[in-house]
Amino acid sequence: MLTRKQLDLLRFIQQRMRETGVPPSFDEMKDALDLKSKSGIHRLITALEERGFLRRLPNRARAIEVIRIPEAVASGPAEVVRFTPSVVEGGRSSAPVKPAPLPTALVSDESGHAVSIPVMGRIAAGTPISAIQSQSRSVAMSPDFLAGGEHYALEVRGDSMIEAGILDGDLVVIRRQDTANTGDIVVALIDDEEATLKRLRRRGSSIALEAANPAYETRVLGPDRVRIQGRLVSLIRKY
């Protein structure tokens, strides 16, 4: 049986993974649980690891994976967490274009059953490559890790997002949408030809596509050259 604090931490990590696709930082977890130091978070994570609910990946920033969810978290009512993330709202491009239709899975937040997410080829976490291809296969996911809406998955190729915990060979689960907030990790279609997985930043009237690896430069483009194809909401890794 988990303690109240352990359950609260697991809920918070699950919530942030659902909202942003990446785990929270230790400072964010400390603030969310109203703890005075990060050592308390380390103890909670160690306890959850020992019980088989979390896994930490060595030498990776924010590399925490939720392995399983206890019934109290998966089926019980969600609790309000005191932490409120600071979000910078991003505006729409001056000439929004409707994204190309894609096979997607519609996820109901009230469903307790696994849903099938179509895998739509590969996405570059490095130099942009062609992506958003035809459906090659599907992957089953618990709706607990997904927000409502339509979703598809892409296989990551490259290492430009490693400091965000996204590795070559991972499957990224994308919520289909054509707008995003500054700081979101998105699938960006450049010049209607190349797709890449990057963090979105707004720089005046321009859009910056930012890597999470210092070996890669940030690309700054006009809004007419970039179309958002979706936002990262979850990640799947096989061992």
Swiss-Prot record:
Chemical reaction(s) catalysed: Hydrolysis of Ala-|-Gly bond in repressor LexA
Xref: NCBIfam families: lexA (TIGR00498)
Residues of the site described as Cleavage: 125-126
Keyword Metal-binding included in the entry's annotation: no
Protein name: LexA repressor
GO process terms (BP): DNA repair; DNA replication; negative regulation of DNA-templated transcription; proteolysis; SOS response
HAMAP family: LexA
Subunit-level organization: Homodimer.
A matching Pfam family: Peptidase_S24
GO molecular function, one term: serine-type endopeptidase activity
Keywords (A to Z) from UniProt: Autocatalytic cleavage, DNA damage, DNA repair, DNA replication, DNA-binding, Hydrolase, Repressor, SOS response, Transcription, Transcription regulation
Root EC class: hydrolase
Keyword Plastid: no
Function: Represses a number of genes involved in the response to DNA damage (SOS response), including recA and lexA. In the presence of single-stranded DNA, RecA interacts with LexA causing an autocatalytic cleavage which disrupts the DNA-binding part of LexA, leading to derepression of the SOS regulon and eventually DNA repair.
Extent of the signal sequence: none
Enzyme Commission code: 3.4.21.88
Active site: 160 (for autocatalytic cleavage activity), 198 (for autocatalytic cleavage activity)
